[in-house]
């Protein structure tokens, strides 16, 4: 860009008249520096260019370097400057004050500011509100500010005003005396803890305020109390040796490296974990920090993860997400309240707290994974009054540097949100079925005890689709937060290593490290756990965490990578014997005076099923009480894994992992509405083992029976594709017998689907009284009280009928697709090439009728569920497999295709377009283009390169093969 064009550009923004320009400035330099960027480097360069163009004499060197570096920073960075930038500015000011005369360029800039009459002068506010400071947004300093009013946020100024520099000796002495009066003991090695001294060091203010601020002064008493609270929390369970602390502190040499480890807890930064001193990193507000400080009082159980938040100044984050393996047998390892940390000499607590470890150090998050033998000792500390859902207590220390506390509660709400007011149906496309009760998690006083890894995975799943402002502005925020939550989840889960935590092993654990000559101690395996029928909540939580990870990855473009997580979930579920019913509870002795018929007991505590767990084989037995809710969680988790195993066997062309034989005696999941209401006594009749009939509106009610039938078809297909025995099997009578049996199961499901529709539509339409009783009897706790109060009985009946018709449409579509899979070919290339002339056989005609029926059901689905939001995770593969025959007809017959087939093709295209909007996947976008191309040929729009079009379609479809060595959708 030439000088003339630059001058012309700057002149268009002039807020001044020519009469107000200072002498020696060009006509083009009428730009108020406040207009473009006050004190920006660009504006100074324009002044320099204009001065040279007019031949004005200037001081050699221009603006002094310190001043230039200080005024070249954006205003947001000035407002939230750190201590180094403050010192830099002070040096620049000193150097500028010692100059013999002011630079002409600075005088011109000052004159422009003084002569500005374009409007009110933009002033720096003394401090931003907590929300704007956290979101790195410009704040006007009002209460409430304009930004909080616009986005409906809570505007408050609760952050502590901090003072630059070191604390005075008087404050240090007061803090030390307060700590001594509090009874803080010295460390185990005899040295006084350095945390009490280092915690008094002052940290950089988040909003750059000076010592004397507009609305208040620095209060040493408040600062001393804050130092006391910080120092009190800094007394760790086991300290590292002094050499380790020296090594950690020695790694921080410059102001632009990591801060010292003695800092107060309020230096936790939230965003931009790539650099250590990023000025765009917001900070947590004081209420959030105080609530975290209250998590672990002195009398709390040290087993709880909530007490593991150290008071170091944490100015870093995840940089590479690497998790290295740590030797589990090390005796001397740094720990925080018995949490084993990596053996790094540089900031050992960093990986545990979601901070980035050094690139060369092992970053393994060695947290105690909940194991079958030790999770009963987990206890919740007293929760903060500001925490809406106390269930989040175990994960709060880990997510403090990632998301605000309020957003974590909102994400938990999103996880349990149902899009249907009549029947429970997860709104998130990544929640394929509810394993847990909503009320158990969201209970205000007695929530379910959960592992931190499970909670982190639930927040991660909800963050994928949440519309919270924290995740949508800027656009990169969601990806950054989700990446940190994913790394945290993996770190807390400790994949494939599920052993007892330090201090919670049995006395004979060390003796059982070697079992039958094989050393298994490093894998967390001991005789205490071998053969144990464990139902500990922590073990179930680990399996559910694997399910969350695998589901989201399966829905992405990295489908092949998801199998490692699904395999881990299936393997751990099999080890925990989730496919078996637990033994009944031992009878509990009745206390004296206790009535025989207690009608006030909690529904979830009725018929308590206590687990008898063998310990060490011959060492007797331990009786553990397992509630009916925990039993139902085990059942639902197994059946969810059972269904996804069969679903993914079709998606990825792989054999089954979980067998029907493993769950022959396992009860079917109870009704979702009764489950959420905790009415375990209402689930009287329960079927056992895999079933083939539709029983309800949920995934377990109508989709699980279809997956049972699909498992039979997958086994048949795998036998058919066997390289040695497949040809013999296809020509034997056993093949025909199995095909007839599977056809009978599909007919049974079709009949049960009709009965299900009649039961939930005709009976509801008979009368308002019966319908209202039916709706009220469903215990819809997932519907908000306002929604229940404002909706009428008639509208709820209509919603229930529509939901029932939608479920029937989905069930009908998948049933027709299973008929196609049973009779036809799975691979699209083999289907289009048709070497065996299957297109002229009777089985092709029967399969084509089912393909058209599936398309008609898809039209009903689009009517009742236009966005395909009911089950987008499962629906895609059945829509694809049901469309291959229609593509074959359009490709082979072209203009001779019947109108019903043309309508079916159009419906398939619309359904794929809706699926892409809800859950965008590459194979659906690809097949939509292929079907569009074939449909255009059917309608007579023949391209000139017809042969090339057909060849291109085959090349695209060749990516997804269901042959013997094909991997289906797993590219």
UniProtKB/Swiss-Prot annotation:
GO molecular function annotations of the record: DNA binding; DNA-binding transcription factor activity, RNA polymerase II-specific; zinc ion binding
Subcellular location: Nucleus
Keywords for this protein: Activator, DNA-binding, Metal-binding, Nucleus, Transcription, Transcription regulation, Zinc
Family to which this protein belongs: Belongs to the xlnR/xlr1 family.
Ranges of Polar residues composition bias in the record: 67-96, 182-199, 227-241, 249-260
Induction or repression: Expressed in presence of xylose.
Residue ranges: DNA binding: 129-155
Keyword Signal in record: no
UniProt-recorded name of the protein: Xylanolytic transcriptional activator xlnR
Composition skew (Low complexity), residue ranges: 9-18
Region called Disordered, residue ranges: 1-25, 55-123, 182-263, 295-316, 580-610
Keyword field contains Transcription regulation: yes
Alphabetized SMART domains for the sequence: Fungal_trans (SM00906), GAL4 (SM00066)
Pfam families: Fungal_trans, Zn_clus
SUPFAM superfamilies linked: Zn2/Cys6 DNA-binding domain (SSF57701)
One Gene Ontology term, aspect cellular component: nucleus
Main function: Transcriptional activator of the xylanolytic system. Involved in the regulation of extracellular cellulolytic and xylanolytic genes and in the regulation of the intracellular activities of D-xylose catabolic genes in the pentose catabolic pathway (PCP) in response to the presence of D-xylose. Binds to the DNA sequence 5'-GGNTAAA-3'.
GO terms (BP aspect): DNA-templated transcription; positive regulation of cellulose catabolic process; positive regulation of DNA-templated transcription; positive regulation of xylan catabolic process; regulation of transcription by RNA polymerase II; xylan catabolic process
PROSITE patterns according to UniProt: ZN2_CY6_FUNGAL_2
Predominant localisation class: nucleus
Taxonomic source organism: Aspergillus oryzae (strain ATCC 42149 / RIB 40) (Yellow koji mold)
């Amino acid at each position: 860009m030439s000088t003339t064009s630059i001058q012309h550009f700057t002149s268009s923004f002039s807020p001044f008249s020519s009469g107000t320009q200072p002498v020696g400035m060009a006509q083009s330099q009428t730009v108020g520096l406040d207009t473009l960027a006050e004190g920006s480097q660009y504006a100074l360069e324009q002044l320099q260019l204009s001065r040279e163009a007019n031949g004005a004499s200037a001081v050699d060197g221009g603006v002094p370097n310190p001043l230039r570096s200080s005024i070249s920073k954006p205003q947001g960075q000035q407002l939230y400057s750190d201590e180094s930038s403050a010192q830099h500015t002070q040096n620049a000011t000193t150097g500028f004050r010692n100059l013999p005369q002011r630079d002409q360029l600075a005088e011109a800039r000052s004159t422009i500011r003084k002569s500005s009459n374009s409007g009110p002068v933009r002033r720096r506010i003394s401090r931003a509100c907590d929300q704007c400071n956290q979101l790195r947004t410009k704040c006007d300093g009002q209460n409430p500010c304009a930004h909080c009013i616009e986005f409906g946020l809570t505007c408050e100024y609760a952050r502590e005003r901090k003072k630059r520099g070191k604390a005075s000796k008087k404050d240090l002495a007061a803090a030390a005396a307060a700590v001594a009066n509090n009874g803080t003991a010295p460390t185990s090695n005899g040295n006084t803890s350095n945390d009490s001294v280092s915690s008094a060091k002052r940290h950089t203010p988040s909003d750059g305020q000076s010592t004397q601020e507009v609305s208040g002064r620095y209060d040493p008493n408040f600062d001393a109390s804050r130092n006391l609270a910080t120092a009190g929390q800094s007394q760790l369970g086991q300290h590292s040796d002094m050499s380790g602390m020296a090594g950690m502190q020695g790694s921080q040499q410059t102001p632009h490296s990591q801060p010292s480890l003695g800092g107060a807890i309020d230096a936790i930064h939230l965003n931009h974990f790539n650099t250590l001193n990023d000025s765009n990193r917001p900070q947590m507000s004081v209420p959030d920090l105080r609530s975290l400080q209250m998590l672990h009082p002195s009398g709390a159980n040290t087993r709880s993860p909530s007490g593991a938040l150290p008071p170091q100044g944490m100015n870093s984050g995840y940089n590479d997400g690497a998790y290295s393996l740590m030797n589990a047998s090390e005796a001397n390892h740094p720990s925080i309240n018995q949490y084993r940390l990596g053996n790094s000499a540089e900031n050992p607590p960093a990986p545990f707290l979601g901070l980035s470890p050094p690139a060369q150090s092992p970053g393994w998050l060695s947290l105690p994974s909940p194991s079958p033998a030790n999770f009963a000792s987990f206890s919740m500390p007293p929760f903060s009054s500001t925490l809406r859902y106390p269930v989040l207590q175990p994960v709060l220390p880990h997510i403090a540097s990632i998301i605000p506390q309020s957003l974590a509660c909102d994400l938990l709400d999103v996880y349990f949100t149902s899009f249907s007011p009549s029947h429970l149906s997860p709104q998130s496309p990544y929640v394929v079925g509810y394993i847990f009760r909503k009320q158990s998690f969201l209970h205000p006083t007695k929530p379910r005890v959960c592992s931190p890894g499970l909670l982190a995975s639930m927040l991660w799943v909800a963050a994928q689709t949440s519309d919270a402002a924290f995740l949508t502005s800027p656009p990169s925020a969601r990806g950054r937060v989700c990446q940190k939550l994913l790394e945290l989840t993996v770190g807390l889960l400790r994949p494939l290593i599920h052993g007892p935590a330090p201090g919670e092993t049995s006395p004979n654990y060390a003796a059982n490290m070697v079992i039958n000559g094989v050393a298994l101690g490093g894998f967390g395996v001991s005789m205490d756990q071998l053969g144990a029928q464990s139902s500990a909540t922590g073990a179930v939580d680990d399996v559910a965490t694997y399910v969350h990870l695998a589901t989201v990855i399966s829905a992405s473009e990295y489908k092949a990578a998801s199998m490692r997580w699904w395999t881990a979930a299936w393997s751990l579920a099999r080890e925990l014997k989730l496919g078996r019913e637990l033994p009944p509870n031992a009878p509990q002795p009745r206390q004296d005076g206790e009535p025989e018929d207690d009608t006030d007991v909690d529904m979830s505590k009725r018929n308590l099923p206590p687990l008898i767990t063998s310990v060490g084989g011959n060492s007797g037995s331990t009786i553990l009480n397992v509630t009916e809710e925990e039993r139902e969680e085990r059942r639902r988790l197994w059946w969810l894994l059972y269904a996804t195993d069969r679903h993914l066997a079709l998606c990825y062309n792989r054999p089954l992992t979980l067998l029907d034989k493993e769950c022959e005696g396992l009860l079917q999941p109870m009704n979702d509405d009764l489950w959420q209401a905790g009415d375990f006594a209402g689930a009287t009749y329960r079927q056992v083992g895999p079933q083939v009939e539709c029983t309800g509106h949920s995934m377990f009610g109508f989709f699980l029976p279809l997956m049972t039938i699909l498992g039979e078809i997958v086994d048949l297909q795998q036998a058919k594709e066997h390289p040695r025995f497949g040809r013999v099997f296809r020509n034997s009578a056993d093949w025909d017998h199995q095909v007839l049996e599977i056809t009978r199961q599909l007919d049974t499901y079709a009949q049960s689907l009709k009965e299900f529709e009649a039961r939930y539509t005709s009976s509801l339409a008979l009368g308002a009284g019966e319908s209202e009783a039916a709706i009220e009897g469903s215990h819809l706790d997932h519907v908000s009280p306002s929604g229940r109060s404002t909706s009428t009985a008639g509208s709820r009946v209509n919603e229930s009928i529509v939901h029932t018709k939608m479920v029937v449409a989905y069930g009908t579509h998948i049933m027709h697709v299973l008929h196609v899979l049973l009779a036809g070919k799975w691979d699209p290339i083999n289907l289009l090439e048709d070497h065996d002339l299957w297109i002229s056989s009777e089985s092709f005609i029967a399969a084509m009728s089912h393909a058209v029926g599936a398309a008609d059901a898809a039209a009903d689905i689009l009517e009742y569920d236009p966005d395909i939001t009911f089950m987008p995770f499962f629906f895609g593969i059945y829509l694809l497999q049901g469309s291959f025959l229609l593509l074959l007809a359009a490709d082979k017959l072209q203009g001779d295709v019947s109108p019903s087939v043309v309508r079916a093709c159009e419906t398939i295209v619309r359904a794929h377009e809706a699926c892409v909007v809800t859950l965008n996947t590459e194979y659906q976008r690809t097949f939509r283009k292929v079907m569009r191309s074939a449909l255009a040929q059917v309608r007579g729009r023949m391209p000139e390169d017809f042969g090339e079009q057909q060849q291109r379609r085959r090349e695209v479809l060749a990516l997804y093969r269901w042959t013997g060595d094909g991997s289906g959708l797993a590219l």
